[in-house]
Amino acid sequence: MNFVRRKFRGKLCAYCSTAKSKTDDHIFAGKFFLEKDRCNLPKVPCCRPCNGKKAELEHYLISVLGFGGRHEQAVENLLTGIPRRLEKNIKLQRKLMASMEPAWLRQGSGLYQPTSVIDFDGSKLEALLKYIGRGLAWHHWGVYLRPEDCVSVAIPIDLGSAVLQSFINPRNFPVRVTNDLGNGTVIYEGMQATEPATLTVWRIVMYGGVVLSSNQTPAGRDAQTSSQWWVFTGPPELGATIDRLKR
C-alpha cells in the first residue's frame, strides 16, 4: 500500500488537475464492493480536498444504491454490507425506512414484479459520476481534464440510453475500453475521440443496473426507469454539442 501511495504522490490530482496529489483514490470506492472483490480496482492520484468531497458523496451512495442491486452479489451485499453502514448513520437509516413504499416494477417481458422504492438524492449520484468520468479518463488514457473542461452527466430513461448509444458513431470514437469490476458490481464502457483526446463518453452500470425513476410520474402510468448512466467530457467549446447529444 505504501508503494502505491508513493507512486501517485506529487502528481497532479486526476479530479481537479490543479492541486498536487497526496494519496491515491479508488475511482469506484472499495466499499461499493464485497471485500473479496476489492482487489485491483482502478486508482488515480488525488488531492486531499477532492478526496474529502468525493468521500462524502460515496458515504451516502454506498449506503443507498445497494438497496436496488440486481447483480449476482446483491443479496449478500444487502444482508452484510449495508446494515453495518446504516448502523453508523441512524439519521439516514430512519430517513430511508420512512420513505420506503411498496411498488410494482415492469420487467422486459411485460410482467410486473413486486418491489419497494425509497427516496434517493440523484444530485449526489450526478456529482460522483463527474469525479468518475474524470478519473477514468486519466486511468485509461492519461488525460487530465482541466477545471474549465465540460464534464456532463446524463441519466436518461432506458429507452433513451438505447437511442443515445445508436447516435454515437464508432468512427468518431475509435478508442474503446470495457471493464467488469467485482463480477458485475460495476460495468463500464469508455469511448475516446482521436481529437481532441479530452472528448470521451462513459456508459456505467452499477449493481446489475440499479433502477432509478422520477417521483413526478403521473398516477396510473408506468414509471420511466433509468438503469444506465452516462458521463460526457470534452473541451468547453464542445459543451453545446454534448448537451445536444444528451437530448
Tell what function each PLM region has.
Residues G52-K91:
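Polybasic, low-complexity binding patches
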Residues L12-K43, K54, H59-Y60:
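Histidine-centered nuclease catalytic patch
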Residues P114-R247:
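C-terminal, charged low-complexity interaction regions
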Residues F3-R6, D37-N40, I118, G122:
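Short, charged/polar micro-motifs that form catalytic or ligand-binding hotspots
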Residues P83-G122:
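Short flanking/linker segments adjacent to small metal-binding domains or redox-active Cys/His motifs
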Residues M1-L12, A127-G133:
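Short, charged surface segments at domain edges that flank catalytic/cofactor-binding sites
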Residues C47:
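Zinc-coordinating Cys/His ligand positions in small cysteine/histidine-rich zinc-finger domains
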Residues V64-F67, R85, N89, K95, ...:
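Residues that form generic nucleotide/phosphate-binding pockets
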